[in-house]
């Protein structure tokens, strides 16, 4: 419905990242009519496992997409966290790296609803309003969805929110990583900590009222910190984790 019948092709990559070689392999894999014709590459920044693409990695991907006539879209649901973590200007990991379109996330950073679509390739923006309406994305009170962005982008609020979330995740990582039975699954780079925990420990934490997902393999958990996470809550979770482990 949203993509008008497009097909999603998955590519392998370390730490949740696409690579130029992986993109090229997908383009050249087959060229017959019974195989989807690649047209757009989409990267998630940060990735689904909490790692970030560096400007150098994105420039290499951007060059490969241009080589094969592909568009480059960035899923930036947590884009602010990536910018805060890398300490770079937003342009360095978007249009200067070859990104054509950015989905700039707000709901992960303090806005109640709504994301922003930023076109760097203005040709792609032609009649976008019609396509947004066709996909059911036109709200009758759009001004109420747009207004929070004024406050979010003013005076660097969006980066302060993201930096705080990242800092809370750093604290969480540092408190729980030394605990016996805790295995860190991916490098902590933004506002997420991915850990493997024993099943009884997971259940014990749930029983104490802590909420988190465990959809990553056997015992893999995603622990997220947000713009309003408090340090005392991070320390309380770490203390409960140690108690559940018996450390």
Q: Each PLM stretch: what is its role?
A:
Residues 1-208, 214-229, 237-245:
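Conserved PLP-enzyme active-site core in the AAT-like
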């Amino acid at each position: 419905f949203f993509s008008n019948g497009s097909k999603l092709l998955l590519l392998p990559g370390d730490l949740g990242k696409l690579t130029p070689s992986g993109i090229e392999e997908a383009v050249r894999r087959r060229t017959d009519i019974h195989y989807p014709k690649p047209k757009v590459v989409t990267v998630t920044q940060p990735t689904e496992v909490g790692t970030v693409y560096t400007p150098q990695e994105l420039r290499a991907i951007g060059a490969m997409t241009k080589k094969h006539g592909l568009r480059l879209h960035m899923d930036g649901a947590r884009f602010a966290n990536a910018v805060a973590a890398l300490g770079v200007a937003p342009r360095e990991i978007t249009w200067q790296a070859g990104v054509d379109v950015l989905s700039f996330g707000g709901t992960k950073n303090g806005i109640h609803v709504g994301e922003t679509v930023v076109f760097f390739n203005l040709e792609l923006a032609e009649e976008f309003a019609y396509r947004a309406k066709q996909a059911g994305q036109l709200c009758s009170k759009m001004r109420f969805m747009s207004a929070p962005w004024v406050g979010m982008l003013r005076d660097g609020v969006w980066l302060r929110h993201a930096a705080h979330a990242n800092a809370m995740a750093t604290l969480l990582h540092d408190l729980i990583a030394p605990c016996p039975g805790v295995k860190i699954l991916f490098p902590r780079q933004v506002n997420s900590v991915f850990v493997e925990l024993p099943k009884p420990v997971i259940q014990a934490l749930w029983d104490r009222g802590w909420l988190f997902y465990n959809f990553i393999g056997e015992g893999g958990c995603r622990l997220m910190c947000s713009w309003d996470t408090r340090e005392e809550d991070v320390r309380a979770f770490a203390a409960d984790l140690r108690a559940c482990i018996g450390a």
